[in-house]
Amino acid sequence: DVLIVDDVQECDRAMKFYNALCPYYQNNMIEIRQSEPYSYCQFVVGRDHTAFGRARHPFMTGSGGWAYFSATGYMLGIRPDFEHLTIDPCIPADWKEFSAVRRWRGAEYDIHVENPDGVMKGVQELYLDGEKVERIPVMAQGSRHDVRVVMG
């Protein structure tokens, strides 16, 4: 399960699972898959069937939503709750940085995560608009903020 990434060693494994399920990485068999190259499908026909490998019902599944939820909330680690925006990535060690934009409660957060030591999990420093903070609170609607995260 991609959502369960609470152990540091699971971060690389979660990325491998995510990539295995990602439609982009299945484009090398598009003639067999016979589905849009960008869509998650409800099911893929099993090996005992004559249509083995074909993907069906691309827009009748919750897989796309769950893939987004898993990737943004648990791998990139950007999770809103009632009072705070948590950023706690669980990424492959070879990712040196990534950026994301998150709109939450009417405010926009430009998030840049740095990983100078090549760790898979652990936030060393968190900055909101250049000021070191412990947590990111709800900000005013219509406002825009820079968030810098240093892993380590």
Language model features by range: what are they?
Residues 2-152:
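Non-catalytic C-terminal accessory modules of carbohydrate-active enzymes
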